[in-house]
Amino acid sequence: MPANPNPAFAGLTAAAHAVQPRTVALRRRLHRHPELGLQLPMTRSAVLDELADLPLTVHRGESCSSVVAVLDGERPGPTVLLRGDMDALPLTEQTGLRYASKIEGSMHACGHDTHTAMLASAARLLSQRRELLTGRVLLMFQPGEEGDHGARHMISEGLLDAAGPAGTPSSAYALHISATMPSGSIQTRPGALMAAADVLRVTVHGRGGHASAPHDALDPVPAAAAMVGALQTMVTRRVSAQEPAV
């Protein structure tokens, strides 16, 4: 513990415990009403309700149900972006929880309801310390994380300019909950921490022929099968065991 800790952090743990019931309530509200993709009207409404009494400048997305909120500190300084995703997955919940999904075919199975509630509570805690903040905080509530390019939509609508010409974020932070870690712990490391899902598209061109003369045809199936095997082997033979790869 530093000899003279930043006063903005004084009592922060106790304050977080104080807002925990509110965080849990918002998370369960979102969990009951999960929404898919870019259009999340109920989710956005819940977020706006939670932010309504805070000293924030709020921007609503037009092409998607995004929310961007800006918290200005009392002194000039850099802009920090905090991001939380909001969309659910196309699954039917069968947990039996009293706050289980009420929407058939939609479930918060990846924790985005928790991420959204945590970000809203972070906005509240930071707002309580506004007079101690240097710079500003940009709060990014993102729809469409599960393959719908929600961040791209938000950037095209001016996310990075939401805090003004001098408010371009100098750093950005996000997190992801994990059921494999003890509750209350945080895991991080320098460099890459989580895998990114990239898309590789390959077209194999064949040539038809007669079944009696396969040697005159070009069968794409064996070639494609060999490529699948080679791509699987690439991770173990072309990437160091010390590097994160799946």
What are these regions (language model features)?
Residues 56, 244-246:
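Small-residue-enriched segments and motifs
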Residues 67-68, 89-91, 96-107, 113-114, ...:
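Histidine/acidic-residue-rich, glycine-tolerant segments that coordinate divalent metal ions
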Residues 2-108, 117-133:
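Acidic/His- and Gly-rich active-site-bordering loop/insert found
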Residues 1-5, 14, 167, 227-230:
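Polar low-complexity intrinsically disordered regions
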